[in-house]
């Protein structure tokens, strides 16, 4: 089954969700809204990408929007989500990727335009969060607004799940070494709420806060209160890495951990959790569609209960693929299939 989807916000995630939807096959984007991007500029931004390269298909501009690989995509420039006529195009699921409408109340405005469900491509203060491979099976069709959590939570949660399910995770600290993003500065500038965040992204390692580790407790309730973490923003354009230092309930060797993660990556978490023994660096993972790629040769163990695990993720491409996967999954559940 192919699901009709709309995207609100044609920024980094909006455009990369669009590209992933074309590759996916089960999701068809038929409408896009962004009040700040007209269609000719949208075509240019979709075609050329400094990080992920030039779009391989065809893009044509017409009076209603774009034709991408022969399929029509209507464009709107509405500021109020309630004014976007999603229903006119048969849109069932809307990807809310502006970063502005991240609460249930705000995101619900899309329902007024005819959409059936809204998937927020960011953490939400009150909408239920789902991480593919971790808790998507708890999805209830009565939910109209849901969140795909964050890119970092999507990397950390599958890893934490494997450790917790097999060895018991008693407590842990996470650091994500995270590529800079659009909210950061090219030169030092004002940032009154986060002074460090106002410093030049390309010249600095910038300590920052993140709720990604605590959010794991929302998708894996048994880990609630057992994980927290922070972020280090670094001068790379894309690809990030999670460093999870944790204690296990059961005694375990690092080799046992590697074997267990490898098995999961080839089984129930295939396509979501990866496993590699290669000498990887961040650019090797650019464009990787998996949520979390465990670096077996980078982790260490202090003893049988205290370990450090390293896992890579393309914070743009991998995360956007999970947004599309989540839509395809809930569409099947909603259809009773």
Swiss-Prot record:
GO terms for molecular function: glyceraldehyde-3-phosphate dehydrogenase (NAD+) (phosphorylating) activity; NAD binding; NADP binding. NAD(+) binds at residues 12-13, 34, 79, 315. Keywords: Cytoplasm, Glycolysis, NAD, Oxidoreductase. InterPro entries: GlycerAld/Erythrose_P_DH, GlycerAld_3-P_DH_AS, GlycerAld_3-P_DH_cat, GlycerAld_3-P_DH_NAD(P)-bd, Glyceraldehyde-3-P_DH_1, NAD(P)-bd_dom_sf. Pathway: Carbohydrate degradation; glycolysis; pyruvate from D-glyceraldehyde 3-phosphate: step 1/5. It catalyses: D-glyceraldehyde 3-phosphate + phosphate + NAD(+) = (2R)-3-phospho-glyceroyl phosphate + NADH + H(+). The keyword Cytoplasm applies. It is found in: Cytoplasm. Its EC number is 1.2.1.12. It comes from the Eukaryota. Changing residue 83 to N: In strain: ATCC 26032 / G217B. Homotetramer. Belongs to the glyceraldehyde-3-phosphate dehydrogenase family. This is Glyceraldehyde-3-phosphate dehydrogenase. It comes from Ajellomyces capsulatus. The gene is GPD.
């Amino acid at each position: 089954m192919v699901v009709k989807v709309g995207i609100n916000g044609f920024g980094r995630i909006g455009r990369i969700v669009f590209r992933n939807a074309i590759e996916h096959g089960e999701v068809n984007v038929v409408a896009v809204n962004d009040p700040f991007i007209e269609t000719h500029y949208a075509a240019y931004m979709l075609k050329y990408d400094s990080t992920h390269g030039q779009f391989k298909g065809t893009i044509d501009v017409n009076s209603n929007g774009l034709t991408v690989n022969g399929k029509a995509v209507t464009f709107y420039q509405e500021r109020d989500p309630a004014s976007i006529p999603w229903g006119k195009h048969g849109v069932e699921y809307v990807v809310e990727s502006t970063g502005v409408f991240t609460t249930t109340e705000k995101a619900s405005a899309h329902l007024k335009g005819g959409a059936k469900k809204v998937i927020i491509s960011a953490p939400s203060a009150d909408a239920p969060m789902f991480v593919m491979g971790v808790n998507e099976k708890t999805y209830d069709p009565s939910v109209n607004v849901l969140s795909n959590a964050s890119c970092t939570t999507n990397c950390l949660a599958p890893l934490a799940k494997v450790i917790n399910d097999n060895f018991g995770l008693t407590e842990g600290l996470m650091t994500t070494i995270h590529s800079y993003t659009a909210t950061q500065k090219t030169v030092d500038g004002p940032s009154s709420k986060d002074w460090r965040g106002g410093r030049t992204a390309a010249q600095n390692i910038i300590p920052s806060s993140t709720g990604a580790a605590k959010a794991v407790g929302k998708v894996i309730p048994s880990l609630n209160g057992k994980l927290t973490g922070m972020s280090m923003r670094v001068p790379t354009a894309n690809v990030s890495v999670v460093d999870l230092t944790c204690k296990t309930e059961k005694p375990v060797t690092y080799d046992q951990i590697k074997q267990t993660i490898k098995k999961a990556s080839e089984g129930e978490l295939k396509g979501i959790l990866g496993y590699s023994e290669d000498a990887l660096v961040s650019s090797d993972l650019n464009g990787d569609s998996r949520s979390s790629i465990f670096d077996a040769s980078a982790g260490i163990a202090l003893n049988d209960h205290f370990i450090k695990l390293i896992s890579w993720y393309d914070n743009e491409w991998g995360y956007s693929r999970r947004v599309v996967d989540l839509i395809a999954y809930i569409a099947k559940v909603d259809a009773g299939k």
